[in-house]
Amino acid sequence: MKKLPNKSLIALALLSVSGASFGHGYVSAYENGVAEGRATLCRVPANDTNEKNTNCGGIEYEPQSVEGPDGFPETGPRDGKIASAENSLAAALDEQTADRWVKRPIQSGNQHFEWNFTANHITKDWKYYITKADWNPNQPLARDSFDLNPFCVVDGGMVKPPMRVSHLCNVPEREGYQVILAVWDVGDTAASFYNVIDVKFDGDSPVLPDWNQGGQIYPSQDLNVGDSVYTRVFGQNGENVSYSTELVIDSEELGAANNWSHALATKINQEQTMLQAGQLNAEGVISPIYGTNPIYLKQGSGLKNVEIDYKINSTAPEYDLEVYGLESEYIIGDSATQLDLTLEATGDIKTEMTVYNHHHESLSSHSAELSDGQVEAATMTLSKSEPGHHMLVVVVKDQQGKVIEQNTLDFHLIEEQTPPPSGEYDFVFPEGLNTYTAGTKVLASDGAVYQCKEFPFSGYCTQWSPSATQFEPGKGSHWSEAWNKVN
């Protein structure tokens, strides 16, 4: 195994960095989107009720990465794996019951669907499907669950869209809980992005006269004895502390997330007349549960919304992991490709590291338990070595197995070449990518030298990323539009 010179030391500060550089896009509701996608609500709460999906696995940290094979419905993800797009990172999204996921309100007729991109690929089209009127919400999502005639198709024109787009679509009439499948067909790869959206059509929800939802108690963390959790209630003139309710954690049992959520909701109902907390049943009765409890505000009270805050008296432990030694490129040799890494821990942690190729195949894994300050070597040998983009996914957990953070580092495997003399080219592609202009010469991965074409084609020379390689010299599907081969 041969390695190129290490250009930079790669350190991963997992508590301060989130998201992956190769991620792409997700259904959002930042501006005028009618509803957030299932994966999006794993990462951020709903913009009006603060409801959030839980127990989502690794996709919580990368909602933009629900990527899978294209061609739906003829090909694409298998039945039962549609929500995850067969991406192991998103496997939890395939769970399907009537009450598993947060549902966003919607009406039939014209609605806007919004996509937010972290990498705006050349696009073939977007398609939107909806479940059949008689679908079974307690069975895994399959092709038979959906009306396979998309109710909305938006042409992408084989160009890059803006970083945020909105599509006006005519949503068919439905009742109750339905799932909308939004498919973004990327034009420069053999992949598509699949976002399912859990929606509830108006007219079937329990009605509570004179009350509106203004927030929720979301049991996001366990608390320790001495900590407290309290409501912050806001009206038209700002926060009104007279409506605040505080729960002090006086036992380890009460500190469990679902327990304090139930206890706080119960205390709100005992102390307040303008606020009520709990799940609303079909009879219009609000009852606290051991889980997420919506908070309702009395109409005419002047109250607008409720937030949950904490007073943490215990010192929260610090967790951090640094990963050193990952090269940006590895040359494929006669022996198996090997990553020689060094791990340094802050706090007592568990780490799970997995190497994937761009097709999401797992090639190597490594697990370790590290104590505070421990430095340990880690060697990962890949099961196969093929040229192209690869990813090292690092997951850090505390000693109880709770995920602290996840991040992804990119690297490439390249074939060994005998390069021409360095005087014949300006850069080894993709070094100096942003500086390429007409006439720039680069040494490509096939060992040949290519020269950037004159305007107006020179703009294509800088359009490259590990997941968008259509203009890569000598390799991409459209490389000849940007480059001339010199030798």
UniProtKB/Swiss-Prot annotation:
Assigned keywords, A-Z: Chitin-binding, Secreted, Signal
- Which CDD domains does the annotation name? LPMO_AA10 (cd21177)
Where on the tree of life does the source sit, at the highest rank?
Answer: Bacteria
What's a GO cellular component annotated to this UniProt protein?
Answer: extracellular region
Residue ranges of domain Chitin-binding type-3 in the record = 438-479
Q: Which GO terms describe its molecular function?
A: chitin binding
> Where is it localised?
Secreted
Signal peptide (residue range)? 1-29
Domain (Chitin-binding type-4): residue spans on this chain:
30-201
What task does this protein carry out? Probably interacts with GlcNAc residues. May promote attachment to both epithelial cell surfaces and chitin.
Assigned protein family: Belongs to the GbpA family.
Q: What is this protein called?
A: GlcNAc-binding protein A
The species this protein belongs to is Vibrio campbellii (strain ATCC BAA-1116)
